[in-house]
Amino acid sequence: AIMVTMAGGKTALEKEIGMNNILFFLLPKAMCAFLDEDSTIRQAMEKMESAGYSSIPILNKRGEYRGTLTEGDLLWALKYLCFMDMRQAEIHRISEISRRKDNVPVRVTTSMHDLIDRASTQNFVPVVDDKDAFIGIVTRRSIIQYCKQTLFPED
């Protein structure tokens, strides 16, 4: 990734935004879909379908980020748990599913450089506060849309 650092240690994007604050891109917890770690497989499938997400954050009862569940994780779970009946999906919990890869969260104080670096490998970046409470996500799409509007304002 190419990042141009300006005087004062800020990247060109940080200078353009006028801040080093990932809250500019944050989709707050109240506006994004997520799963409780005790959710059933069926609940996970239904929530992901209704939200249109291919991956979704998992939170514990305290609201802390615990990981990411993907469509691929669900597909492999159906194979390994050997069921095609949705009633079985009501019995099994997402905690029984092996997850291929969790999206790594960032703190709300993370630099724009680190946020963009993380977003380059994850379709969304979970954001946590200093007590590890999940406060929302930053989507790769929101960063790309901002860059497009900034670089090509005539579009």
Task: Kindly give the residue locations of the regions a language model identified.
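Short, basic/aromatic recognition patches
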Residues: T40-E46, T109-D114
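A glycine-centered beta-loop-beta connector
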Residues: M48-A51, I56-D73, A119, V127-S142
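A short beta-loop-alpha structural element at the N-terminal edge
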Residues: L35-D38, R107
